[in-house]
A protein has these predicted regions:
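Assembly/oligomerization scaffold segments
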Residues: 1-165, 195-216, 221-223, 251-255, ...
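Acidic, small/polar-enriched beta strand-loop surface segments
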Residues: 1-51, 160-168, 206-372, 376-381, ...
Length: 414
């Protein structure tokens, strides 16, 4: 059965973090201003199409529910290799001498004339296998997204990271410090101001996640490889968008709902300490009586004042003091003709989702959630995505919202 979208896998042998084709003057393909990327010429052709030899694709991206933060997106692409092109010691290979770690790989899907990136990352491992009794070997190309680059880049001081700048400006300063490409950023202006950079030894990823936490926003790498920083306001209001409906009668069909009803995500006591400040405590007494104490403690936040730290503690507890039945994940099969392919390919973090599930007794469970993870499994005969779904990571009151605009229920954010 043909897949509902045309899948392509491109492999870029050029160095650097930027995805794209190098600009080549006079070339019909690479000589387009605004399309080609300024880069040194390479041999072999910098970007090659691996699609004809791809056997399977596995992509894992999303927010870790228990750690409450985004993690590096990973991908494993299995490529059949009948001519041993991916053998790094094969001098006859056109890739000889260029097959190194941290080259760029992208997975895209094209549907109805529109292309969607499903993954953009950097190779970290080549697992070559020659199965016994088979004539054709294969290589598993293992990739991580730009979080890997940021985790490897240690920093002490950050240039231009002065007191009073907003968290979005601080995120940009950290990315500048590690020379992350400016054309691969989408940075909101922060709602919170920062202390001067503390000058401690840490990874750039730790510094970026600290800024996002101090904002109570989000920092992640999207499917096109862009570093995205969402401020608190946009994180909150994203939950009020018109949701995509998934159900068993007219909406997008699904399977394998993962239900949970437990205390794992409850936080009813939070202590937040900024750099140079004192611990600020917020608690929900009713939640503590009901569920016992569930505590969290964060230190060295870069929020500028103790009042900011207290607000972080308050909104963190307000968002997590209660629990209810959860839908943590669902699987959608794109081979099902009732599934709108373009809609599923366009999902990204913070997309609003409304899931309705009919129970055997005729009752229903209805949850309005957000997409916070996408796991793709693609072969010549399969195209499925498992969607991680979560309640909003930061609650707040939004006027005219049926979900976030309920007086007496919705959280008044700062």
């Amino acid at each position: 059965m043909a897949l509902p979208a045309e899948i392509s896998v491109s492999f870029d042998f050029s160095s650097g973090a930027t995805f794209g084709y190098p600009l080549t003057l006079g070339d019909a393909k690479y000589g387009l201003l605004g399309t080609g990327t300024l880069a040194a010429s390479e041999v072999p052709e910098p970007v090659v199409d691996l699609t004809p030899d791809v056997y399977s694709i596995s992509i894992r991206r999303g927010r870790n529910i228990m750690r409450d933060q985004y993690e590096a997106g990973t991908a494993t692409v299995r490529v059949l290799d009948p001519l041993s092109y991916f053998n790094p010691q094969n001098t006859a290979s056109p890739y000889y001498g260029y097959l190194t770690p941290l080259r760029k790989l992208r997975v895209a899907a094209t549907y109805a004339g529109t292309s969607y990136f499903l993954y953009s990352g950097y190779t970290t491992e080549y697992r070559y296998t020659y199965p016994q009794g088979q004539e054709t070997g294969y290589v598993d190309i293992v990739c991580n997204d730009a979080f890997r680059l940021m985790q490897q880049a240690a920093i002490t001081t950050v240039a231009s990271a002065t007191a009073g700048q907003d968290t979005g400006t601080r995120v940009s300063a950290i990315l500048n410090q590690v020379t992350f490409p400016t054309n691969m950023r989408s940075i909101d202006t922060g709602n919170t101001t920062c202390v001067a950079d503390p000058g401690t030894s840490r990874t750039s990823l730790d510094a970026l996640l600290n800024a996002a936490y101090s904002e109570q926003g989000a920092f992640f790498i999207n499917s096109s490889g862009t570093a995205v920083f969402k401020n608190r306001t946009n994180t909150i209001t994203s939950a009020s968008a018109t949701p995509i409906e998934f159900n068993q009668s007219g909406g997008i069909p699904y399977k394998n709902l993962v239900f949970a009803f437990d205390d794992k995500l409850i936080i009813n006591s939070a202590s937040m300490t900024r750099v140079g400040g004192s611990a600020q405590l917020a608690e929900n007494a009713a939640s503590i009586v009901k569920y016992f104490s569930h505590q969290t403690n964060e230190t060295n936040l870069i929020a500028q004042t103790d009042a900011d730290a207290l607000n972080i503690a308050k909104i963190y507890v307000a968002t997590r003091a209660e629990t209810t039945i959860r839908i943590d994940a669902m699987t959608v099969d794109l081979l099902d003709t009732a599934v709108p392919t373009g809609t599923m390919l366009g999902l990204e973090y913070f997309t609003a989702l409304k899931i309705t599930n009919k129970q055997p007794d005729g009752s229903t469970i209805v949850k309005t959630l957000q997409c916070q993870g996408l796991d793709w499994n693609i072969t010549p005969n399969q195209m499925q995505v498992t969607v991680t779904t979560l309640e909003p990571i930061t609650d707040g009151f939004t006027l005219d919202s049926a979900v976030q605009g309920i007086i007496g229920t919705s959280v008044l954010a700062y």
